């Protein structure tokens, strides 16, 4: 295979997909492919997809349609669909989109080079199995790092079976990667210049291996010289073990930020969602987390318009939001996903869902602006990730995951500095460097 072949990857959805796209690029890099940011010049286009909402899935088909002129002009162009839409729809993608050469599910990325080779003879290839072998054992060593931060998948899959969610069907059962392999990969990342690692999993705090839970893993990772920061996402409230909560108060390298989805503040809706916890349990959990780390910034996920949601249910969600005070949150109208239990229930009127979402987002936006404004005057650690748009400007992330713009000529990505926050905006902060 020619060393000059180019690969374009479009990534949809969660951080796990970002990580998976990096690993697929590395797997194909071993076959001579180099990344390009221009689809028109690529020899292979790979869409790494998200199936969590209907709009995300339909966007994939729309984007595939836009690739048709490229395929017509260059029949040798290879087009692949990866990720959760690939896993969920499989053969349907090949049926609807004749231009697609291969379809690969999240658990089969290590087979991608072989699949691509099989398409060279004109075959259309699909692999959406859940293989017994560990895909991570068959992927090459990570090489192309884009900056001082990196994702590290520690856990995949989900056993929770929330009534609205496709993840258990597209990602499979919960599987924890071995402790020793994670430590080795983390050390290798640090040797390549990484200073912050975010641990990933569909239910990352369900990770367990070798007698350790996620709190124990974090404590061991924190002992790696040169690794300055740790984060993890996404968590389920039912898997917030005591040891993990204690780590937030005891481990300085674990950043004071936690994404803890709750979805609703109504016990009736939480039960219908099969979340297996009540609103009061979530509130007590928040109290325990803040007792361990009082300055922690909490974010969450919310769904409005779940089948059967009444005005009282929605008001209960607003009450929970007011009680917690979130730094930010992702919020969506309910989207029925085929094959999930909730998809069989009658949906609420779209106008009602739109109105509830607008009300919810107004409250969340108010809390986010307040959280941003509260940072003004504080001194925070900021890890520079890239140059800003203005001359001499750097952009990095604060301890609380805020984007921070700092005028700091001569600084470089990877510098970890102290910054006094001088201004807050809707989605970022500005500050001045005061030290290291």
UniProtKB/Swiss-Prot annotation:
Its EC number is 2.8.4.3. Keywords: 4Fe-4S, Cytoplasm, Iron, Iron-sulfur, Metal-binding, Plasmid, S-adenosyl-L-methionine, Transferase, tRNA processing. It is an enzyme of class 2 (transferase). This is tRNA-2-methylthio-N(6)-dimethylallyladenosine synthase. It comes from the Bacteria. Pfam families: Radical_SAM, TRAM, UPF0004. Catalyzes the methylthiolation of N6-(dimethylallyl)adenosine (i(6)A), leading to the formation of 2-methylthio-N6-(dimethylallyl)adenosine (ms(2)i(6)A) at position 37 in tRNAs that read codons beginning with uridine. It comes from Cereibacter sphaeroides (strain ATCC 17025 / ATH 2.4.3) (Rhodobacter sphaeroides). PANTHER family: CDK5 REGULATORY SUBUNIT-ASSOCIATED PROTEIN 1 (PTHR43020), MITOCHONDRIAL TRNA METHYLTHIOTRANSFERASE CDK5RAP1 (PTHR43020:SF2). Residues 144-373 form the Radical SAM core domain. The lineage of its organism: Bacteria, Pseudomonadati, Pseudomonadota, Alphaproteobacteria, Rhodobacterales. Binds 2 [4Fe-4S] clusters. One cluster is coordinated with 3 cysteines and an exchangeable S-adenosyl-L-methionine.
